[in-house]
């Protein structure tokens, strides 16, 4: 509490954290969505195909996501990592990394792509019809380019708080049981798109 009281400015990226900081410090605390949501982006109107399955901080969640990827015939594994070394051009090395990183050892693995840059990663998200992930920033980028997503719980409930502030509630959260039955398509409703666009607009205005 003393550390918070000593700060000249208190800011958080979700309303729940801002309220907790304000209660603990007795000072005003502002909040604005993650800055990635205020970035310019292209590709929202392009044709989409396939399913991207991402990763998570938690090994247990990565195992669930890897098993989910195996369910879909057109799924690709695209983690948040950007790896530029030429060694990862080797299918053998990618297959080994996939198995070790996710803690699963299937005979065959889904296509495994590691974009070299954040821009390339965003383009992959913008071109898919569904993104399944356990990463907070992957969800942010999905909203940025209006790609439908399903999200596993994150550490410290970051994703849940993000979606609450965005007006999406828990409809886009998925536990392992739901992912076992998930369809390869989960388009946004009109209300969801309206909420996401309003949230991005608010993020842009507060970031200025």
Task: Mark where each language-model region is.
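Active-site anion-handling motifs in enzyme catalytic cores
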Residues: 1-208
């Amino acid at each position: 509490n003393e550390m918070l009281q000593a700060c000249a400015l208190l800011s958080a990226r979700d309303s729940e954290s801002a309220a907790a900081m304000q209660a603990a410090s007795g000072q005003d605390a502002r909040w604005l969505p993650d800055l990635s949501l205020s970035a310019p982006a292209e590709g929202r109107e392009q044709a989409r195909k396939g399913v991207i399955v991402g990763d998570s901080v938690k090994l247990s969640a990565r195992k669930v996501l890897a098993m989910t990827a195996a369910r879909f015939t057109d799924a690709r594994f695209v983690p948040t990592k950007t790896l530029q070394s030429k060694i990862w051009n080797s299918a053998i090395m990618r297959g080994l990394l996939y198995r070790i990183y996710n803690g699963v050892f299937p005979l065959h693995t889904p296509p495994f792509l590691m974009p070299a840059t954040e821009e390339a990663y965003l383009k992959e998200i913008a071109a898919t019809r569904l993104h399944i992930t356990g990463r907070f920033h992957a969800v942010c980028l999905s909203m940025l380019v209006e790609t439908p997503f399903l999200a596993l719980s994150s550490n410290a409930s970051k994703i849940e708080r993000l979606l609450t502030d965005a007006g999406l509630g828990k409809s886009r959260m998925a536990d392992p049981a739901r992912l076992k039955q998930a369809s390869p398509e989960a388009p946004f409703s009109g209300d969801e798109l309206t909420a996401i666009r309003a949230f991005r607009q608010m993020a842009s205005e507060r970031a200025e």
